[in-house]
Amino acid sequence: MERLADRVILVWGFKRSLLAIAAGAFAVLALPPFGFFAAMFLSFTLLVWLIDGAAASPDSGLVGRLWPAFATGWLFGFGYFVAGLWWLGHALLVDQDEFAWALPLAILGLPACLAIFYGLAVALARIFWSDGMGRIAALAAGFGLMEWLRSVVLTGFPWNAIGYGMMPVPLMMQSAHVIGAMGVTALAVFVFSAPALAGTRQGARNGTALAVLLFAAHLGYGAYALYVAPRAEALPEDKRPVVRLVQPDIDQAAKMDNDADRNAIFETHLKLSAETPKNGGRKPDIIVWPETAIPFILTDNQDALTRIADTLDDNQILIAGAVRAEEMGPGTPTRYYNSIYVIDGRGQIIAASDKVHLVPFGEYLPFEDLLTEFGIQNVVEMPGGFSAAVSRHLLALPGGLNLYPLICYEIIFPDEMTSDIEDANAILNITNDAWFGATPGPYQHFQQARVRAVETGLPLIRDANSGISAIVNAQGEIIAGLDLEQTGFIDATVDRFGLEAGTTFPRQTYFWLTEALLILIALVSRRGFISGLN
């Protein structure tokens, strides 16, 4: 092991850059749809050894001393994000005549920008670097901090945070309920980096023992949470509301075609909603359609509301994604919102919620006045783009069920869960992942949604146009679901009483405590290392 470590530490030039990129790319095997979490042991072991060799002249100043470490982290991140996000280019090929030119920006440009966070994580860790356990603690703290920053800087984009590689199955997701996904990221980097200690001997015994203990605690808490969950207070099966998820699997190109038969798309949703329950099951109390399922402005189409009323029973509720238009008065452009409507059995809209966190360059154009001068436009064709809602609120349904609405990629942001999550009975996530076809993207999106359920202790109702649609319990376990690119529906019950829902505050507190402990370990280790040199 020491010989291998020495070879990696001493590698230089192009081979060093290639090895850093390859290590980052290999780590993606830990993410959906693969879920091979052991891949990250190799990736982070190589990263630690590469940082060991990222030396600079002591006279080169702070920036000069940290630059080799930053470059190593950036190369690792570039490989990770190119391998993990290449599928974003698929969305640009839906209308390739308009957007194919942007493929290099999506496949290489975005990863290059996101990799800056990993470069900063490694540079920060290098400040506390020492020849022992402290260096993997410093690396874990650096990644934890930078993954958190990645979720909040500018509009934020925490997709594929390292921690998700340590949460491939519900058993390994439960720690997120305590320390959140970012806390699991810090834990994961420490554990995945531990084999690197065997290559330098210094601190290997204590560091490895601590990593094994933390990993065992991670698994042990997961087993405990899954064991006690079925014993939590719950409604009897026949008293739980039945939810139908409609998955029409309509091709995105057809949805964007201005000449498409929009009534046919609408009727597809109605037909699936009216299907007889399978195996003699109860009729659904709630029917859910995916994001932007209604292919026209619903409030301008009374016939469509009448068709919905004809399809629903009096006591049924439809929750549907739609574009909402808001007239602003003479001389002011109409505002459009990516919205959720709640419609009762009489065809009346009884509640609505608008998307707060819009997708840059997809639903709105940052610096619009400047960029439109260069011919750059939104992927979603909407005059002026979508408008963002100021805040979101619970969807209160008849019968006392409160849903916390998140549209599309809003579900990937841990900090989107505000304090009113405590009053929710379930998370509602509607999305349209047909943009990305049968690529890893929809699988990654679904995993992050499952982790939000675990974090909050709430069941998840997730409906996607082309999949993956599912009812997920508060422990991230799939109760019922439809896989990618399947057409159909599922009926399942949703228990209103899962584990007690937490707030964002305790998880954030425990995350920062985790960060502080890791930095303390790094400082103590470095102090001991420096003392040993004197």
Swiss-Prot record:
The active site is at 291 (proton acceptor), 355, 408 (nucleophile). It holds the Pfam family CN_hydrolase. PROSITE patterns: CN_HYDROLASE (PS50263). Coiled coil: none annotated. Signal peptide: none annotated. Gene3D superfamilies: Carbon-nitrogen hydrolase. Residues 246-496 form the CN hydrolase domain. One of its GO terms (cellular component) is plasma membrane. PANTHER family: APOLIPOPROTEIN N-ACYLTRANSFERASE. NCBIfam families: lnt (TIGR00546). This is Apolipoprotein N-acyltransferase.
